[in-house]
Amino acid sequence: MVKQLINVIIAGTVVVIMYNFLSHQDILIGDMLQKESVKGAYLTGAGFLDVNIKLWIYRIISIVIIIAVYNFIRGIKKEESKKILFSIILIPAALIIVFIVNIAIDSIFLRGNDIDREKEYILQNIRATEEAYNINVENKEIAKGTDITSEKIKKDSELIEKLPMVTPDVVKETLENNTDNKEKKSLYKYGNPNLVKNGNAYDYLTTREIDDKDKTLTNKIYKYTHGNFGILTSSSKVNKNGYLLNVSEKFEGQELNGTKIKEPRLYYGENTNSNAIVNAKDIKEYDYPTSTLTNKENNYNGKGGIKLSLLERIALAITKGSTELIFNNNIVENTKVLLNRQIIERAKKILPNIRYDKDPYLVTKDDGGLAWVIDGYTVTSRYPYSQKVSIEADKGGKERINFIRNSVKVVIDAYNGTVDFYVTDTTDPFISTIMKTYPTLFKNYNELSENIKKQMRYPQYLFDIQAKVLTTYHNSDVDNIYRADDRWEVAEVSGSGTRSSTSMYTLLKKGDELKPAIITTYTPEKRKNIVSYLVGQTENGANKLTMYRYNEKSELSLSFIDTQIEKDEKVQKEMRELTTLGAELKTVRILLPYEDTTLYIKSIYQVFLNEDSVPVLKKVIVANKGKVGIGNTLKEAMQRMLTENAIDIDVRDLANEDELKDAIIKQNKTLKDVMKQGDFEYTGKDIQRLIKLVDQLEEVSKEKKKKTNIEKTN
């Protein structure tokens, strides 16, 4: 009995010591600077007290536990009650002493200015955060915003006509509700529209995958087996009646990115969930409609799938729990079964160790075939010192992470189903470990064709996370991170009704051409003026971030200027003229950087209130620097923005008077605290901030009096 008790105690001791050891590691991903005197949010990592006090506390506790257990066991063996009692008292006594010492040290250290003490550890947090999120930003100052003139519009006429004013949401809504497309609509499920290069223009490609909903099991497995490329819709033009312009809806003979598509069939896809049996006896696959009454048929001739020999049929019957394949009369020598056709699940079955982007996209191959690209990420929440952010979890809800790298590009052949994993970031420690586990699985990124590299885009999932991190870490000065004096917020760049987006794919003018990019904008915390915009671009498959900062007077946010436009009587008159019985107006807002200024584009669509109604573009409103123009096209609206009939709006972002008063009170309190600490460097900085806030309050008060006097005069 005594021996068993001793073994239990020893096992318990080992568990406690292991827990203490793991607690050492947790300090590196815990929260530092948790005291009320710290103005900013918690930073991830071990601070001065963690490294110099808490780590030693864990070590001392481990030693005390070992001594106590050793004495306890000896006391039991020799039946010495004093040793047993001493051992029982030792651990709680040590914990009480450690607790008192910890409080005393905390209070002593927090009396002085702790920025100098914590500087080294905050710097580690900054470096680790930039490394963990792969944030290598090129900063560019915008000294003076570009003035849009008639000469500039004339010179850039061709480029302006190619600027995207149509959003992916409108494209998808149109395709799904188009009454002229009923037959195709019942056959196909449309993917998310993606901006692609098509000749000299950029269009939206919306993939057409077979929709197996409401189809019999036989039709689902044998007949309706595959989708077909997609529909190309102009991102910048509509037809003469205002309907979106489908550049190409063909099922064969399409061209994309300078490559003629020879094999447009999609046997593997984003929305292809069912298995398929191809080349079955006396059964032809549906290919695509050639007219309202006739269809083209097809037989699969790809490398994908498993030939259904008797042995394979028995194995599949056991796996699927069904004997249907064994006794199936439709199976002949060339019959194959195509399994795991949903591309993300297909990749997961091969490599479950990484996270996959939920928005794959289609690219053309050198041989005229099609392939899907899926971005793969390594993600963790246990990277030492890197700042944690809250994101949408892979399976719903929220999760906190502090490391993400887009280290893998997965390329899946849409016809054959072959899967290739290309490593894009060999500096990623996690992918390096995975590569050692699966040495033959990965390919070097240089092996991927240049044609596919050119078609790759910056992943929106990664971009949004990096943009969120940069709300704080855009200014990586230690003092700024410590005091949180220069925080930004991510602003809206596009919106429609209640839906809005903080990032979007668009085209940016670069010299004399347009380049695809993903953008987001920033405003200072609780303000509406845009101080910067972040651009993500992919050059030959490599992701690149550029931060454009306004040096002088900043631009205004989309939501603010949209409200100002809606208040104008001339705009309201135009809107009333478009109002028709049985229809509603739908507005789509876009913020678009154009050289060193920003265009605020508001597209007005008319939507009839019947079940299958599509948006019809009626007007385009453009605003820039207090001037607003309305036209039938973007170019026409920009031209009218420069005429005498242009609408003037007030674009000053005057802060709320009560908010400013609260900010002054808060800043005054901060100043007093800093003066008590005797920190002359921060005293000077805080005085400057207080003066700035008082100046802003004075400006708001003057404006308020001015408006009151005008109202009295009227």
Model-predicted regions and their roles:
Residues M1-Q677, E681-E711:
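Soluble extracytoplasmic regions of secretory-pathway and membrane proteins
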